[in-house]
C-alpha cells in the first residue's frame, strides 16, 4: 500500500480524535475536516483544511450538505492503479483522499430520549457520513476507513511499522466493519421510523432489522450432528449470559448457554440471597437463604438427582465456602454469579472443566425488551415477560396465612421459568417438587409430587403454583391428596367456580393473579 497522504476526518464521537490526528500529522498527512471536528483540531494546534476549501464549494443548507461533492467522492473512489480513473481525476482536479475517519450522528442516542421529537430524529439521520464511509469501504484497496475509535491504535501501529501505510488486509477488515456499522445504523432508523407510519407509535415497526455479532464458534449445536455458533445483540449491556465473563473452564456449549440463560434470568427474580439449579432449561431446585450457602444447600436437596450436571446461578457474590460445597458435592457444568471472589475462583480451579462465569450485578427493575422466537420462515416477537402479576385476589373462603403467601409468591416466581405446563410445589422459600413440560397440567402436578417423594421431601404443608389456570377441578383434588394447603394460579377458566369450590371443599386457600406465565 502507498503511504497515507491525505485524510478526511469528521466525527460526532470525538474520543481520541485529537491524539489520532496529531499522530497522522506527524507522518505528514494533510487533514481535511468539517464543522466541530475542524474546530476541535485547530484548537489543539493541528493544521486542518476545511472541506469547503478543498472542494471550492461552501457548506450549505444548515450543514446538511458538506461533503456531498465529486471532489470528495472522486478522491475516495478513484482507483489508483486504474489509468482511466487517474486521468479523469487529473482532468477534473480531483486529489486523492487516502483515509476516511468518520462516525455518525447519534441517532439511537437521540431517539432514546423521552423528549425526542420527529424533527430531532430527522436531524440526527446522517447522510454525508454513511456516504463517505461506504465509498471508502468500497475502495478499500486504496483507502483506509475508520468508523470506530477503538481502531485508531491499530492503524497507527501499522503506520509506524510500515513507514506510513496500512495493509490491504487491515483495510479490508475495517471496510467490513463499516458495512456492519452502516447496516445497523440504517436498521435503527428503519425500526424507529417504521413504528411511526400511522397514527401514534406502533408497538412493532413495519419491518424489523436486527444485528447480532458473532461471539463464539462451537464444536456443535444442540446435538453433535448440528453446527452451532453464539451471536450477541449489538449494544447489549445488562448483566446476562451474553455479557458475562468466563473466568475458567471449557468453552461454553450451545446447551450450556441456553441453560445458563434460564438459570440466571430466574435467579434475577429474587432480592434475597438465592440459588437456582437448572437442567435442560428447567429449574430443578430453587431456594432462598440467609446466605447463598444456605440457598444452595436447600436448592440442591430439592432434587439431587436432576442437579447432577446442572447449571447453578446465584444473585450474590460467590464465596469460597459455597464454591467448595459445590465442587465437593456434585458434578456441575456451569456456575454463574454477579461476582466471584478470588478464593472461590481458586477452589473451582481444581475442577478445570467447570465453567465459572461472572456477569455483574443487575438493576432491580430491568428495562423493557423484546423476546424473539424463530419459526420456519418467520419470527415471533413479543414483549419480554418481566411482570409478575396483575393482582393478588383471594378467591376462597380461607385466605392464605402470611407464611403461605410468602411461599406462594416464591413458587409463583419460579413457575414463570418452568416449561409449560408448569407446577411448582414449595415450602419455606424452597422448591419441594417441580413438574415441567407436560401436555396435561394434572400430570405436571403428579410429577412434582413424585419428584418430592423421590428426594425424600414431604409435600404435606407445601403450597402450589400453576403457570396457567386449572381447566378442571382435578388439579385441586390432586393437590389436596398430597397435602397442599394453598394454591396460586392466574384464574380465567370457564370452570373457575368449580375449581374454587374444590379448593373450599379441601380447605385450601387460593389466590388468583390474573396473569398467565406460559413458557414454551
Swiss-Prot record:
The entry's keywords: Hydrolase, Multifunctional enzyme, Purine biosynthesis, Transferase
Pathway assignment: Purine metabolism; IMP biosynthesis via de novo pathway; 5-formamido-1-(5-phospho-D-ribosyl)imidazole-4-carboxamide from 5-amino-1-(5-phospho-D-ribosyl)imidazole-4-carboxamide (10-formyl THF route): step 1/1; Purine metabolism; IMP biosynthesis via de novo pathway; IMP from 5-formamido-1-(5-phospho-D-ribosyl)imidazole-4-carboxamide: step 1/1
Catalysed reactions, semicolon-separated: (6R)-10-formyltetrahydrofolate + 5-amino-1-(5-phospho-beta-D-ribosyl)imidazole-4-carboxamide = 5-formamido-1-(5-phospho-D-ribosyl)imidazole-4-carboxamide + (6S)-5,6,7,8-tetrahydrofolate; IMP + H2O = 5-formamido-1-(5-phospho-D-ribosyl)imidazole-4-carboxamide
One function term, GO molecular function aspect: IMP cyclohydrolase activity
GO cellular component annotations of the record: cytosol
Gene3D superfamilies the record matches: 3.40.140.20, Methylglyoxal synthase-like domain
Ranges where the MGS-like domain occurs: 1-147
Gene Ontology terms: biological process: 'de novo' IMP biosynthetic process
Name of a matching Pfam family: AICARFT_IMPCHas
UniProt-listed SUPFAM superfamilies: Cytidine deaminase-like (SSF53927), Methylglyoxal synthase-like (SSF52335)
InterPro entries per record: AICAR_Tfase_dup_dom_sf, Cytidine_deaminase-like, MGS-like_dom, MGS-like_dom_sf, PurH-like
EC number(s) on file: 2.1.2.3, 3.5.4.10
Free-text domain note: The IMP cyclohydrolase activity resides in the N-terminal region.
Family membership noted in the UniProt record: Belongs to the PurH family.
UniProt protein name: Bifunctional purine biosynthesis protein PurH
Higher taxonomy: Bacteria, Pseudomonadati, Thermodesulfobacteriota, Desulfuromonadia, Geobacterales
